[in-house]
């Protein structure tokens, strides 16, 4: 594992979404830092909570924006968010029950975020008015 670096190919061109995605990357890097520094379980859990809470807030914002512009694939996009949220909850529960799932959670966040931005979020960009970019 290593710190993530934001690259321009991850930009959607929608400023508010890009800022939120960059913030999620910061939270992922915070988790990596906590794990690398062998922070205690409470500190790691706090970082996990911040990461998960912010990601869920981002999902709600993104879904609201897509609804506002009548994005035809909103239900499918929401379903992807819900599947991911279920995976994250499972890993957080495993972490809470003394199974060290923090590295697995970090890896899931990295893989899912970049794939989601490049393959799923990119699909809705043409449907959002340029005034929102």
Language-model region placement:
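Small-residue-biased structural context
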Residues: 1-133
């Amino acid at each position: 594992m290593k710190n993530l670096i934001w690259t321009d190919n991850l930009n959607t061109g929608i400023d508010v979404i890009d800022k939120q995605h960059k913030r999620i990357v910061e939270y992922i890097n915070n988790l990596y830092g906590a794990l690398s520094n062998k922070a205690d379980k409470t500190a790691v859990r706090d970082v996990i909570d911040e990461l998960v809470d912010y990601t869920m807030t981002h999902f709600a914002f993104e879904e609201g924006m897509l609804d506002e512009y009548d994005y035809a694939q909103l239900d499918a996009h929401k379903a992807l968010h819900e599947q991911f949220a279920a995976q994250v909850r499972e890993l957080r529960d495993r972490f809470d029950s003394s199974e060290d799932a923090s590295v697995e959670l970090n890896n899931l966040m990295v893989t899912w975020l970049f794939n989601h931005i490049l393959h799923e979020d990119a699909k809705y960009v043409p449907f959002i008015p340029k005034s929102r970019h």
